[in-house]
């Protein structure tokens, strides 16, 4: 085991811990900002949709689900369901939740939302390197499937 891979579990725990802290910071209740009421409702809908997306994607992984970017021993390369639209649907849901919280809580949530975005982007890149090593088909999947935001596809007539 080389020096770099020996530290991966510790780095993974640190990343997951930071993610938990940032999500707590986003979820912490605050007095509503002076945004228009409609904007706050849009934020609530976005946050709820983000939770649903993350939850459905997590359930789809079944026993292979792990908060760590290190793939579990039961991990398989998933190309179906939400994983056919984006490579990281759980992270996509969390990013949508963070954007929604910005609309419902205002400036008080900018720092945790930006930090969460940067952390999830870094975790995704790390996870993709590990998945490429473990699954030979991963690079072709990554080349055709967006990371976080689904591509708009034209309908065929």
Range-by-range predicted roles:
Residues 1-79, 96-157:
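Membrane-anchoring alpha-helices and their flanking helix-loop junctions
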């Amino acid at each position: 085991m080389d020096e770099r891979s020996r530290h991966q579990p510790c780095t993974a725990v640190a990343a997951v811990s930071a993610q938990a802290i940032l999500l707590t910071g986003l979820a912490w209740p605050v007095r509503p900002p002076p945004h228009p009421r409609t904007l706050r409702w849009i934020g609530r809908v976005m946050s709820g949709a983000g939770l649903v997306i993350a939850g459905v994607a997590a359930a789809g992984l079944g026993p292979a689900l792990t908060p760590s970017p290190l793939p579990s021993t039961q991990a398989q390369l998933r190309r179906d369901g939400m994983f056919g639209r984006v490579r990281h649907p759980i992270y996509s849901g969390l990013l949508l939740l963070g954007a929604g919280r910005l609309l419902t809580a205002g400036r008080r949530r900018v720092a945790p939302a930006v930090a969460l975005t940067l952390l999830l982007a870094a975790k995704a890149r790390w996870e993709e390197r590990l998945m490429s090593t473990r699954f030979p088909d991963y690079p072709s999947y990554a080349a055709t499937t967006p990371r976080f935001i689904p591509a708009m596809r034209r309908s065929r007539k």
